[in-house]
Amino acid sequence: LFRSGQASTPLAYLIGKTHPDVSYIEVVSSIASKSAGPATRLNIDEYVETTANAASFFSGCTNTKAILILNPAIPCVNMQTTVFATVGQNNMKELKVLVDEIVAKIQVYVPKYQLIVPPTMEDNRIIMTVQVQGLGDYMPSYAGNLDIINCAAIVTAEEYAKKNLKSA
């Protein structure tokens, strides 16, 4: 079962699945500056490269770009990710259905993963935006960028343990 600690990867995958002629994907994420600790700040270049590579790998598009914005606003903003894609043919009907399905699946392990701008076509460009809030249990609710990683790791570890307990 596919589990992603990245908000954009499932969306890029679905764009590639429904639009095999995708020629460009851009991922723009904005996170609260306070949710980016020293380790995050030291690894921004790695995050940007990994995000662009994941968009490419899962969509099949070789021309990808990722941008990360550390927003210093007070009160802190929730994590938000917008995916832009340039496509040839329009297959928005199937994309919208699949995006709704994947959002529901992600919400099982990341309850506050929300589609706030559904897939929209403008000329030959697809735009969609998700917002991720944390549960606010251990970290502030604006730290959705940290919660999505933790939630994906927890559910993956739980599934791994269940599988290994059954085979033992």
Question: Could you tell me what each predicted segment is?
Answer:
Residues 120-168:
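NAD(P)-dependent Rossmann-like dehydrogenase/reductase catalytic/cofactor-binding core
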Residues 2-122, 136, 140-143:
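Active-site-lining helix/loop region of Rossmann-like oxidoreductase modules
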Residues 1-3, 167-168:
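N-terminal leader/assembly segments
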